[in-house]
């Protein structure tokens, strides 16, 4: 998608056409670890510092399928959700850099689809 500008109350593309944003929230399940949420198994529930959110909203191997489908439905806007627990679940100042790398790759792939 081209860079948009604002004219009055409208989004305008580089050709001067009005653009209607059609989009979705992606990642409604982002608040729980992957794959099973880590809260529905008694053995996992207490170990909140040793979880992974890599795979939320979906595994990278499935990204093309999901983004292609959204584009085919006419979506041109995406709100990619995450939660702070995914970034700092191990404790204050302990960032999950593997998750941040995963999330950056999901965002990059989304950009490939406009």
Would you name each region that the model predicts?
Residues 47-114:
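Aromatic-lined substrate-binding rim segments of carbohydrate-active enzymes
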Residues 20, 30, 88:
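Active-site-proximal flexible loops/turns
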Residues 20-24, 78-80:
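Hydrophobic faces of well-ordered beta-strands that scaffold small-molecule active sites
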Residues 1-21:
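N-terminal module-boundary/linker segments of secreted carbohydrate-active enzymes
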Residues 25-62:
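Acidic/histidine-rich helix-loop elements
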Residues 4, 40-44, 80:
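Short amphipathic alpha-helical segments, especially helix-boundary/capping motifs
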């Amino acid at each position: 998608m081209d860079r948009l500008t604002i004219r009055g109350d409208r989004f305008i593309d580089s050709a001067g056409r009005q653009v209607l944003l059609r989009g979705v929230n992606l990642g409604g399940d982002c608040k729980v670890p992957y794959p099973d949420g880590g809260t529905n198994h008694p053995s996992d529930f207490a170990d909140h510092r040793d979880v992974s959110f890599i795979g939320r909203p979906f595994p990278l191997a499935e990204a093309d399928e999901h983004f292609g489908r959204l584009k085919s439905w006419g979506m041109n806007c995406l709100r990619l959700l995450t939660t702070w627990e995914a970034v700092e679940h191990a404790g204050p100042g302990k960032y999950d850099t593997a998750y941040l790398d995963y999330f950056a790759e999901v965002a990059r792939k989304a950009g490939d689809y406009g």
